[in-house]
Amino acid sequence: MFATQTRINQNFNSIPDDLFEAIADLKKELNAVILAHYYQEPDIQDIADYIGDSLGLSQKAAETDADVIVFAGVHFMAETAKILNPNKLVLLPDLDAGCSLADSCPPEEFGKFKAAHPDAIVVSYINCTAAIKAMSDIICTSSNSVKIVKQIPTDQPIIFAPDKNLGRYVMEQTGRDLILWSGSCIVHETFSEKKIVQLKIEHPEAEIIAHPECEPNLLRHANYIGSTTALLKYCQESQEQEFIVATEPGIIHQMQKREPKKNFIPAPAMNNCACNECPHMRLNNLEKLYLAMKNKTPEIMIPEETRVAALKPIQKMLELSFT
């Protein structure tokens, strides 16, 4: 049930001097749209047609009239675009751009977990494989997870997968008792509570803003919790001038562009490393994006049976997001 992809040896192609111009030319030639997640490197964000979180990117993928979708993100995002657009060419610059959270929920094991709770419906966070989506009743994102769970009858048992931290946050916000799959994101679990508290002492006027994939002991220090889009909006609307940002630091590029006079401090990891950067998101770069468009590969392909099954819960999410 896993999505399959095709590769090409990208070493055979020369790289033009002006990648921005070359990519712009290919966009016109292919009638392509470039969708990029906030966690991508700044150059990719700057050349993208749309930058957003998982919900916004899903909505754009569903709406686009482009013939080619170039997805600057990780593979579950590109899979979602393909699920919504079976007749379009969907490209992912680097097929190794996976997701630790999606990998934490193997389909075979999740199938057994689901079978152990036959009366429960499955609400799956969009950060999962096409195979898990196909086993789900409703998909959600960090933007709409609380809203979606609130719309489910209170007497209906719910399995929430794969992110246990987002699941705990949804439980807290809704008062619902969810059956949680124990998955997590390596980036959002690497932030150091001790170092963030120390940062707050050093920057007493700064507000701590955090993504709900962070662990509960960190979220309790946050002045605001939200999806990447919600964090971005909050920084724009807040009167405060300094923020400690507890999510992947790629979002700070957009924060600085929209609020250049404000100061944004990346939340530190437990170790002295760049572990607060997603290693999968950072596999993409302009060169790979150009080569993907030039060669029309790597292409995302999903077995039709899996795609059709995965489409239903995604459509349900999109419907509930507008109610």
Swiss-Prot record:
UniProt xrefs under Gene3D superfamilies: NadA-like (3.40.50.10800)
The protein's required cofactors: [4Fe-4S] cluster
Highest taxon of the lineage: Bacteria
Chemical reaction(s) catalysed: iminosuccinate + dihydroxyacetone phosphate = quinolinate + phosphate + 2 H2O + H(+)
Binding site for iminosuccinate: 37, 54, 125-127, 142, 211-213, 228
Pathway terms, separated by semicolons: Cofactor biosynthesis; NAD(+) biosynthesis; quinolinate from iminoaspartate: step 1/1
One Gene Ontology biological process: 'de novo' NAD biosynthetic process from L-aspartate
Residues that hold [4Fe-4S] cluster according to the record: 99, 185, 278
Location in or out of the cell: Cytoplasm
Keywords: 4Fe-4S, Cytoplasm, Iron, Iron-sulfur, Metal-binding, Pyridine nucleotide biosynthesis, Transferase
InterPro entries assigned to the protein according to its UniProt record, in alphabetical order: NadA, NadA_sf, Quinolinate_synth_type2
Cellular component terms (Gene Ontology): cytosol
Family: Belongs to the quinolinate synthase family. Type 2 subfamily.
PANTHER family assigned: QUINOLINATE SYNTHASE, CHLOROPLASTIC, QUINOLINATE SYNTHETASE A
Biological role: Catalyzes the condensation of iminoaspartate with dihydroxyacetone phosphate to form quinolinate.
Entry protein name: Quinolinate synthase
Organism: Trichodesmium erythraeum (strain IMS101)
Gene: nadA
